[in-house]
């Protein structure tokens, strides 16, 4: 009798474990969402009108990107869409809103990564590409390479008929004024003092696939040819299924040295840290070496994190577990 009771109890325990595991898998599969950022820096000088413009753009982009995921679309499509929307706006330092280098030329960078197989594509120092993020995805899908730069990337864009524009498309009197101001102050912290920044997105789709994408015009008054963390896989962008997706913004040289995006996922994977702890601790540690910036992240359960150590960071999120959220400070 005791033996039969023991067997029954063991069978019930096994059944309970199976049901718990199945529920966990179902919950994970049903989780989806997207997080975006529009850059970190000194944002306190933004006018109320400008703040409203930015918040409205972020909100509209989140709603549309969320709809892609809700309808069963891929995380890759969602992050590419979100970043390209920001590239088409003059509100952010990417695409049309890109800042000038010291030669009064815009040089843009972008990268995208698929967490399902860790495939990635990136472009750097491109000057005539309307949407660098779209070209980055084409590098991923249509070449055997990860990163194309400058003229080589632009030739590839022409070959595949990606949208090419005249440099006048990126002209901005406001950004020229900022360049002149930057030349006068000769500061290493231009990217932090700028009032607009790098853009990025991370997403989890219904199939459990995570993707990340980042794009930028770089640092005002940067040396021609300077490339920051944005197109560097592991620094500005990282996506890894079953762990997390990360997009960075800030002082790119430090983010490259510390492999910030990948470090978040590494701490989760090997130290069993939560998304919030891993991402927040890294941003705090960067502050100790006077490295300014922020990150956005999403994990396999659609938990999100958006820490920063600057005056503000344009950011927002929308998941099936949480309401639409948009903030600057």
Region roles according to the model:
Residues 15-24:
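Bacterial N-terminal signal peptides
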Residues 29-329:
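Alpha/propeptide regions of enzymes that mature by internal proteolysis
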Residues 5-15:
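Bacterial N-terminal signal peptides that target proteins for export
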Residues 6-7, 23, 300-302:
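Short linear motifs in intrinsically disordered/low-complexity regions
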């Amino acid at each position: 009798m005791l033996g039969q009771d023991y067997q029954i109890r063991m069978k019930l325990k096994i059944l309970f474990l199976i049901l718990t595991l199945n529920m966990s898998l179902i919950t994970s599969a049903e989780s989806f969402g997207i997080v975006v950022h529009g850059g970190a820096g000194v944002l306190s000088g933004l006018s109320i009108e400008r703040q409203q413009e930015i918040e409205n753009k972020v909100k509209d982009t989140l709603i549309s990107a969320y709809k892609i995921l809700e309808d069963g679309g891929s995380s890759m499509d969602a992050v590419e869409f979100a970043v390209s929307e920001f590239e088409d706006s003059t509100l952010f330092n990417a695409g049309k809103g890109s800042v000038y280098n010291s030669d009064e030329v815009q040089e843009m960078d972008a990268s995208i990564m698929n967490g399902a197989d860790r495939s990635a594509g990136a472009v750097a120092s491109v000057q005539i590409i309307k949407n660098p993020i779209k070209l980055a995805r084409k590098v991923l899908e249509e070449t055997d390479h990860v990163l194309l730069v400058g003229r080589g990337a632009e030739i590839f864009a022409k070959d595949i008929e990606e949208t090419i524009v005249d440099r006048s498309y990126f002209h901005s009197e406001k950004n020229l004024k900022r360049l002149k101001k930057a030349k006068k102050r000769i500061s290493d912290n231009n990217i932090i003092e700028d009032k607009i920044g790098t853009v990025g997105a991370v997403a989890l789709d219904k199939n459990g696939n995570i993707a990340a994408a980042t794009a930028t015009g770089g640092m005002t008054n940067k040396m021609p040819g300077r490339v920051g963390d944005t197109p560097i896989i592991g620094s500005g962008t990282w996506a890894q299924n079953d762990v997390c997706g990360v997009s960075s913004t800030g002082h790119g040289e430090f983010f490259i040295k510390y492999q910030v995006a990948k470090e978040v996922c590494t701490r989760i994977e090997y130290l069993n840290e939560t998304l919030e702890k891993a991402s927040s601790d890294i941003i705090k540690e960067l502050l100790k070496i006077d490295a300014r910036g922020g990150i956005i992240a999403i994990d396999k359960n659609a938990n999100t994190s958006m820490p920063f150590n600057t005056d503000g960071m344009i950011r927002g999120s929308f998941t099936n577990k949480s309401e639409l959220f948009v903030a600057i400070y």
